């Protein structure tokens, strides 16, 4: 019975002897158990451990063999090219091997990916684009009025000239505040003839309105005395006109723009 067991284990032992450095020795406790009890579990435990060790050794050997196999037999897919000169220099033990290998790699990369030439140096400085005048570009800080606006709206000088001719009976001191208000509303006249419109002050708007109301009240207080002195009447209805004609008084003249503009909010920009 022992002879049969020994003959059965001989091929496995021979296989294990072929890899003495890879296989592990069988546990020493398994031999006396196997010899003492041939049919006991100790023999099977030792044989299974031996098979496990053999499988590990064979797997490691196969993996090592596949890893060391020549790359030419595996094909060109997924295989890196081996630099033979670098391998020879590494085998000889020279220190210049890494530098030569890097130079070879750089040459290969330059061949596969050609390096582009650098852009030419900029010799001429880029000049800005020539802009038009501010009047054409409409970006001037002082807006320029067109000829149509000049034609429709008279200048402040013309308005001042027309005011005394339209109302010759009104003295000059009464027309001065109106001219100053017109100047403020219309804007300042520049030396080149352009009119710069004044920007309305929205913050101090209430104070400006109060000052305008005071000016109009002053003119109202002064205007009735002038009208009564000159014989004018405020109401120009047909009845009043007939009565004034019967009394022999001269017919009332046409009301000027200054009288029409008198009100809670005088519009000094409209000239009739």
Swiss-Prot record:
The keyword DNA repair does not apply. Residues 1-17, 155-165 have a biased composition (Polar residues). It comes from the Eukaryota. It holds the Pfam family DUF4628. Transmembrane segments: none annotated. Residues 1-47, 111-130, 147-272 are annotated as: Disordered. The modification Phosphoserine is found at residues 222-223, 249, 258. Disulfide bonds: none annotated. InterPro entries: DUF4628. Keywords: Phosphoprotein. The keyword Transferase does not apply. Residues 202-220 have a biased composition (Basic and acidic residues). This is Uncharacterized protein C1orf226. It comes from Homo sapiens (Human). The lineage of its organism: Eukaryota, Metazoa, Chordata, Craniata, Vertebrata.
């Amino acid at each position: 019975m022992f002879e049969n067991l020994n003959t059965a284990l001989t091929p496995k032992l021979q296989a294990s002897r072929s890899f003495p450095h890879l296989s592990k020795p069988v546990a020493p406790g398994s031999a006396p158990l196997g010899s003492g009890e041939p049919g006991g579990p100790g023999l099977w435990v030792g044989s299974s451990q031996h098979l496990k060790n053999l499988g590990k050794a064979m797997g490691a050997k196969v993996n090592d063999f596949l890893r060391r196999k020549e790359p030419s037999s595996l094909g060109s897919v997924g295989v890196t090219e081996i630099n033979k000169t670098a391998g020879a220099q590494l085998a000889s033990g020279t220190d210049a091997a890494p530098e030569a290998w890097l130079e070879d790699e750089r040459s290969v990369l330059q061949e596969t990916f050609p390096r582009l030439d650098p852009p030419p140096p900029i010799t001429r400085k880029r000049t800005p684009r020539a802009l038009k005048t501010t009047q054409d570009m409409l970006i001037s800080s002082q807006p320029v009025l067109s000829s149509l606006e000049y034609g429709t709206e008279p200048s402040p000088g013309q308005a001042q000239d027309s005011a005394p001719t339209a109302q010759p009976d009104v003295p000059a001191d009464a027309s001065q505040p109106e001219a100053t208000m017109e100047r403020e509303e219309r804007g300042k006249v520049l030396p080149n003839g352009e009119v710069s419109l004044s920007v309305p002050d929205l913050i101090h708007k209430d104070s400006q309105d109060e000052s305008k109301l005071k000016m109009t009240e002053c003119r109202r207080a002064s205007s009735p005395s002038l009208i009564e002195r000159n014989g004018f009447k405020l109401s120009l209805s047909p009845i009043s006109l007939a009565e004034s004609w019967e009394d022999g008084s001269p017919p009332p003249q046409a009301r000027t723009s200054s009288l029409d503009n008198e009100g809670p909010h005088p519009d000094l920009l409209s000239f009739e």
